[in-house]
Each structure stands twice: as C-alpha cells, then as structure tokens.
C-alpha cells in the first residue's frame, strides 16, 4: 500500500554534500604536509577527532574545521595564527558550498509533491542546513522542513508527532543506514534506502533484512514504486 507522507533526507539524497567535506579533508592534510607534518598521521587524526568531537561540536563544516584546528594544535602546540585562519577559511568554504542536485531529483520531486505531503528532514547546524535548503531549487515541493542536531529513533518519533503523521502512512527516504533507515525502522516506518557512493563513513551501518526496507539505485526510481 502506498503511504500518504514522505520524509526525505537532504544531504547526499537530494544534493551532493559529503564530497565537499572530503575535499576539505584533503586540503587540510596537504596544509599539514606542507608544514612538514606526517601526511598519514594528519589524515588519521582528523578522521578520529571528527568522530570523537561530534558530541561536543555537532555536525557540519565549522565542526570539521574545529577538529582540523585541534589536530593542528597536536602538531604545533604553539599555533601560527595564519594557519588557524587558513583552516577557518576551509571551513567557511564548505559551509557555503554550492548546491548541486543529484540526478533525477529535480524531475521526480514535483511529481511526488502532487501526491504526497513531504518533509525535508536533515541534521546539523541549522544555519548551514537552511542555507543549502534556500539555495536548492526544490524547497517549494515540501510542506515542512525539520533540522535536528542528531537523527535517531527519538527525533524521528518527534517529527511524526509534530506533523501528525501516522507511522503506517509514512515512508522515509534517505542515503544513510544509521541516520535515515534505522530510526524509521525503529518507529515502524517503511523506508527507501538509496545508497550513495560518497556517504560519510560515520553514516554506514549494516542493515537488517526487513520487508520495511526497499533499496533503490537511483532517486528517479521512486516514481516506479510511488507514482
Ligand atoms: Mg544524507
């Protein structure tokens, strides 16, 4: 049976996102290597600190930049202000990166919006996320936008409650097993998992076998099952 409501993830589901963070990561490692520091160590330290810092710094470009500054201070306990400014600039560039829609999204969303009530559901820094949403050409197709610090079963349940959406009448669509699919499953909501090659490592998780999870290889294929 088809649902009435669609809750749709934004980053790496509607538009490219993680590649900007990956590019910034590489720029930081090169910056450290250029100062004579070990490239592999800069790379692994940044990965580790980014994961460890999520509870303190949250998600997003400036959180990544703060982790870069932390790594830099491990290499140079007396930091150079110009290097710190350079790291800040890397973060700002990611913060306001251009929004490139993923293939099929702009063609499919208008069709879905004629039939479903749709919610954009995203996590991270509200200013950063809302900036991308404003820049995107698809905001008009959504009835609601919700940005939370973390996507988990509890925040997912609250979104259902806030918008008065019954679990059995709602589907979740996203690229992240951990942040999109598992929270939906925990709330009895069917989901469509659309894997993306550049999804952040921290978002990966083994998915259980479930009749509540449909996997598609491209966004436009939603029209095959929802229209
Ligand atoms: Mg995503």
Describe these PLM feature segments:
Residues 1-45:
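Active-site neighborhood of HAD-like aspartate-dependent phosphohydrolases
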Residues 1-4, 106, 110, 126-227:
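Asp-based, Mg2+/Mn2+-dependent phosphohydrolase catalytic module
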Residues 24-29, 46, 50, 87-92, ...:
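Hydrophobic alpha-helical core bundles mediating ligand binding, dimerization, or RNAP-core interactions
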Residues 34-38, 76-79, 137-140, 164:
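Short helix-capping segments at alpha-helix termini
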Residues 49-93:
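A metal-dependent, Asp-based hydrolase signature
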Residues 82-100, 105-136, 145-148:
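Substrate-recognition element of Asp-dependent hydrolases with the DxDx(T/V) motif
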């Amino acid at each position: 049976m088809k649902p009435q409501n669609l809750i749709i993830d934004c980053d790496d589901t509607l538009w490219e996102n993680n590649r900007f963070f990956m590019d910034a990561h590489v720029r930081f490692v090169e910056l450290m290597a250029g100062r004579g520091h070990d490239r592999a160590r800069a790379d692994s330290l940044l990965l580790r600190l980014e994961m460890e810092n999520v509870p303190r710094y949250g998600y997003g470009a400036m959180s990544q930049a703060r982790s870069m500054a932390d790594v830099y201070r491990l290499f140079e306990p007396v930091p150079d202000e110009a290097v710190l400014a350079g790291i800040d600039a890397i973060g700002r560039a990611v913060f306001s990166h251009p929004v490139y829609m993923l293939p099929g999204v702009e063609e499919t969303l208008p069709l879905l919006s004629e039939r479903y009530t749709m919610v954009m559901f995203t996590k991270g820094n509200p200013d950063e996320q809302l900036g991308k949403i404003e820049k995107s050409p698809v905001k008009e197709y959504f009835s609601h936008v919700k940005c939370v610090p973390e996507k988990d079963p509890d925040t997912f349940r609250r979104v259902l409650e806030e918008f008065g959406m019954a679990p059995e009448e709602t589907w979740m669509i996203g690229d992240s097993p951990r942040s999109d699919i598992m929270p939906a499953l925990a709330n009895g909501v069917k989901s469509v998992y659309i894997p993306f090659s550049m999804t952040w490592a921290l978002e990966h998780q083994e998915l259980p076998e479930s009749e509540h999870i449909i996997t598609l290889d491209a966004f436009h294929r939603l029209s095959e099952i929802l229209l």
